[in-house]
Amino acid sequence: MKKSTAFTTRLITFTAMMTALVMVSGFIPPLEIPPIGRIYWCDGVIFLGCFLFAPLPSFIIGGMGTFLYDLLLGNTVMMLPSLVIHGLQAFIVSFLLHKVFPKKQEPLFAFSACLVGAAIVIAGYFLTRILVQNRGLDYALIRMPSDVIQEAAGIAAALLICYGLRLKTALTKSGLLPEVSVRKNSWEKQDLSSDKKEEITEENTSDDKNDGKEI
């Protein structure tokens, strides 16, 4: 019971910290690119959370972090879209990385998962500007390059911090990172089970051959 409680407390604490970090990163002065727009930093923090945590905590980090940012900013129109878009982004990226893709060559598969998450964000904000903000198709198309650059910058920053600076490795070795985010995925288990089956069949065939020789 004590181990389970400590694990739950650690997971909740890390999730709350990352959620707050996403919210605070939204208030950091953005990078101004006059022809395109502003590049915010919150996407990099969201992708980093996806690398470190399981799908459900990642959903909370991405969705609630941006939701609280819009709430404090007074942008009530975007609160729900931010929750859905960034929550889905974080959940899908984490799910692909920890549950679908094999653990070998993780940085490469992390990049692939981030591309899917970036597509979700770009499509989500494209539809939001048309359907929720009523800005029209032209405005949505004009803002799309800004979203693409922002997602690219977020992916690059998250990959650099997590794998380039070996943050995930350091947290895992120190025991601070909750185990649910680094457990083996189903592909590895299937590979191990298939290897065991092959070994068993090889042993059986060799036994049959030996029996035949003895006869």
Where are these regions (language model features)?
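Loop-helix junctions at membrane interfaces
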Residues: 1-215
